[in-house]
């Protein structure tokens, strides 16, 4: 009681229908809402009431002369621009019509005068504000927090609009960039225990991305868990078009350690495990096949950090959910195509590197040797090539029968990577295929591979 509620069109009708007495915005401004609601609150009677500093006698005197009352609390939900452009088939005209003008103007004005006006843009803050009102008044600390929320909110809102308009114009790398992300979770620590960390979702979460995954079992994901799992999913995506085979990818410290294609998930997992049974311990396993009881039973024999799959049978979950330290994630849409225009970003000290997301495959192949590769050899070459694309440089991968044999990642010279991958391949190196993530500057790598 004691509060006068000023409301615009739709909000006023909802409140009045619910038995809440309101004052229409037109009664405050003395001017009707017009242009299909485009102009409602853009009026001095509103903005002077928001911006007048109560501690400034001149401000208060001017309000009195103009017959304008102060406004103490503003509650606004902006037009749903994000929801609008997320709809399939949305037109440019519909998108533009859902760009809020009066709302952002009003909440920014209110936030500037934070000492006198509380402004609420996030429904999650309603309870806090109401409890303080019931206790006697909104504290200055809360008003400053709400001020911050306003400018963060409008920054995200404007970012969505500018990025949408840039996309419509085909602008890949604009003069300035802003990206909107929403916090998904805080983490116990980052890459190392002394580093704080959080995980943020993109405003538009991509189908098949880690942010879409549903955690079925286990503790919260750590910083390193998310980084490694993302690396595994990016490699797994290379096999999305192979609908005849199931792929299993094992990753350790952001590098593949065992990768295989097979007719069943269980067979593919066993081959991936056998490729490097030492490194996969404590690793990440992702697959584009359903995990059944047989697969789960094999997976449960060792310590794995995370398993990601599009689906699990009830029997598989019963087995896996007995593993205390395992995280089990379900990710439908794991074979979905990525949209065009994705960007890859890397923060560097004082700047941001932005490039097109690497969705490139192999175009036309040239065989300079007299002997052409057999169909099977070509299959293994292409398989090894997909692996090396997602292995830290200098990288060499060796594969046979569409299973990784030896992976040599992150070496400072290429011959070391070759020697490492050959050593790890063991006897399987005979008749295998080798891929390199860059050219051979000298013949030493070729000679080492031929000698193996």
Predicted regions and their residues:
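Flexible, glycine/proline-enriched loop segments at strand-loop-helix junctions
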Residues: 48, 86-101, 114-120, 132-149, ...
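Short hydrophobic/aromatic-enriched beta-strand-loop microsegments
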Residues: 4, 19-32, 74, 118-119, ...
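ATP-dependent carboxylate/acyl-activation modules
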Residues: 76, 157-159, 165-452
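Glycine-rich nucleotide/cofactor/substrate-binding loop typically near the N-terminus or early
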Residues: 10-81
């Amino acid at each position: 009681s004691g509060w006068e509620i000023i409301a615009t069109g739709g909000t006023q009708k909802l409140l009045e229908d619910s038995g809440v007495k309101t004052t229409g915005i037109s009664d405050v401004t003395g001017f009707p809402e017009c242009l299909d609601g485009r102009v409602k609150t853009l009026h001095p009677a509103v903005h002077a009431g928001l911006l007048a500093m109560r501690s400034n006698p001149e401000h208060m005197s001017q309000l009195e002369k103009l017959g304008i009352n102060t406004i103490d609390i503003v509650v606004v939900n902006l037009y749903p621009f994000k929801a609008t452009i997320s709809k399939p088939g949305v037109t440019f005209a519909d998108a533009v019509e859902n760009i809020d003008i009066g709302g952002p103007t009003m909440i920014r004005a209110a936030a500037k005068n934070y000492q006198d006006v509380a402004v609420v843009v996030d429904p999650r803050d309603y309870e806090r504000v109401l409890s303080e009102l019931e206790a006697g008044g909104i504290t200055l600390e809360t008003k400053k927090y709400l001020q911050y929320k306003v400018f963060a909110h409008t920054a995200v809102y404007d970012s969505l609009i500018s990025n949408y308009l840039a996309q419509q114009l085909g602008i890949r790398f604009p003069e300035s960039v802003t990206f909107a992300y929403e916090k998904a979770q805080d983490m116990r620590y980052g890459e190392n225990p002394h580093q704080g960390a959080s995980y943020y979702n993109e405003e538009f979460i991509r189908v098949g991305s880690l942010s879409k995954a549903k955690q079925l079992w286990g503790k919260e994901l750590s910083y390193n868990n998310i980084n490694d799992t993302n690396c595994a999913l990016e490699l797994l995506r290379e096999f999305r078009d192979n609908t005849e085979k199931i792929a299993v990818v094992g990753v350790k410290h952001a590098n593949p350690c065992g990768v295989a294609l097979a007719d069943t998930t269980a067979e593919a997992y066993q081959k991936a495990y056998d490729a490097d049974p030492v490194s996969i311990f404590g690793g990440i396993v992702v697959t584009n096949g359903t995990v059944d009881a047989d697969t789960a039973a094999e997976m449960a024999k060792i310590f794995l950090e995370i398993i990601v799959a599009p689906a699990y049978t009830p029997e598989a979950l019963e087995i896996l959910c007995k593993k205390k330290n395992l995280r089990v994630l379900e990710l439908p849409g794991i074979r979905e195509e990525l949209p065009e225009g994705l960007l890859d970003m890397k923060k560097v000290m004082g700047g941001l590197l932005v490039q097109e997301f690497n969705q490139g495959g192999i175009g036309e192949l040239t065989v300079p040797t007299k002997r052409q590769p057999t169909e099977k050899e070509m299959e293994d070459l292409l398989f090894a090539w997909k692996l090396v694309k997602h292995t830290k440089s200098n990288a060499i991968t060796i594969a046979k029968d569409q299973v990784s044999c030896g992976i040599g990642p992150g070496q400072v010279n290429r011959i070391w990577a070759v020697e490492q991958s050959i050593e790890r391949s063991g006897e399987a190196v005979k008749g295998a295929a080798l891929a390199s993530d860059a050219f051979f500057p000298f013949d030493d790598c070729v000679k080492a591979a031929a000698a193996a």
